[in-house]
């Protein structure tokens, strides 16, 4: 026995289903990369904001103590008083110092290689010095 399909009977053929799946796949292929780049751009912006916040807090630290924290004391000196430091009035940052937006530690150097201010660096997405695009370093002396 064979059943005939009535004109009023609704249904989706395999071809129609494949066309819909193909359209969805093409849409995802076009939209997802742009969304991923937007997230990476937001991380670069956050890293710059973090570095600017550290620089501001370091300025207040220096006003109180007369010096910047050493490389060994690091950015933690903005949250916890280092041994032997006079006139520390911190904490100079409200939140704990975590990693950069890619979960790599920020690099702090004082004395720095770029003037009288400390060097603060996020090594970007790849966590390695140098790089281009989202792998590029985000640094305090270029903000």
Where are these regions (language model features)?
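Alpha-helical hydrophobic helix detector
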Residues: 18-34
């Amino acid at each position: 026995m064979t059943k005939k399909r009535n004109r009023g009977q609704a249904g989706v053929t395999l071809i129609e289903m494949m066309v819909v799946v193909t359209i969805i796949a093409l849409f995802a292929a076009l939209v997802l990369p742009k969304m991923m780049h937007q997230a990476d751009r937001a991380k670069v912006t956050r890293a710059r904001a973090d570095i600017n916040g550290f620089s501001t807090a370091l300025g207040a630290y220096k006003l109180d103590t007369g010096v910047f924290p050493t490389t060994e004391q690091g950015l933690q000196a903005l949250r916890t008083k280092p041994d032997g430091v006079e006139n520390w009035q911190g904490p100079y940052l409200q939140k704990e110092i975590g990693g950069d937006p890619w979960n790599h530690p920020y690099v702090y150097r004082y004395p720095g290689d770029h003037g009288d201010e400390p060097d603060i660096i996020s090594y970007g997405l790849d966590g390695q010095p140098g790089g281009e695009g989202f792998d590029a370093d985000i640094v305090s002396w270029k903000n």
